[in-house]
Amino acid sequence: SLVGSEMCIRDRYGNIFLENRYTDWGNYYPYRTLRNLWMLSRYVPAEKMQIEFLNKWRNADKYSTTDPFAPARYSFDYLFAITLAAQPLAWMEASNLPEEAYATATLLKEYQPLQLQFHQGIILPIGEEPSGRSWTGFQSIVSDTQGYLIIYREDNDIAKRTIDTWLPEGKKVTFTPLMGNGKKFVAEVGVQGKVSFELNDKNSFTLYQYQVKP
């Protein structure tokens, strides 16, 4: 099978590079990159995949000014954040970035000490399939009682959304934000791991550490 072949390739060669996408061709769409990772992460360890983020300022004229999913409509922080469950790949020449891009270095420094811990867990997709309009994300299950969640609010008008996770039904869980725009909260997990998350801004994210209470 294709998945079996991919697993063999991974075990033999290490990280997997999925595909070239370039703003030159107008075929780099951040939500599609996120969707590829989300769909494959059920079958291939996310931490083995190299997922690209590009210079959103380059070739902006290749996209329609009315295209809601054009790279220029996203923050550079968000473009980096969609790669966090995988191996982030800066698919660009850093020398061509504008000065404002370097503010994302702060986010990178925040993530570096967390990456190994996040990747030690079993990483699975949660929420809805990324479509550019969804609430979606990933869960890293480090143990029965702790792990991490990355929650993404794509371009939609819903500031609070209940999504399915892999958390145990009926348990109380503490969610502590480590990166992004979320707030600390405690919730009781519903049927099918349902938990409500809140993000005030479109195309925003939060990386939470979670702890399941006894």
Give the label of every model feature segment.
Residues R10-Q112, I151-R153:
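Aromatic/acidic polysaccharide-binding cleft in carbohydrate-active enzymes
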Residues I9, R153-N156, L178-G180, Q211-P214:
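Short, flexible beta-strand-to-coil junctions
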Residues Y102, T106-G132, Y152-D155, I163, ...:
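Alpha-helical protein-protein interaction modules
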Residues F185-P214:
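C-terminal beta-strand-rich structural cap/linker in extracellular carbohydrate-active enzymes
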Residues E129-K171, F205-Q211:
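Carbohydrate-binding surface patches
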Residues L2-I9:
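Short, small-residue-biased leader/transition segments that mark boundaries at the very start
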Residues W166-K183:
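Solvent-exposed beta-hairpin/edge-strand motifs
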Residues P68-A70, L79, S134-Q139, T162, ...:
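Generic recognition of flexible, low-complexity loop/linker segments
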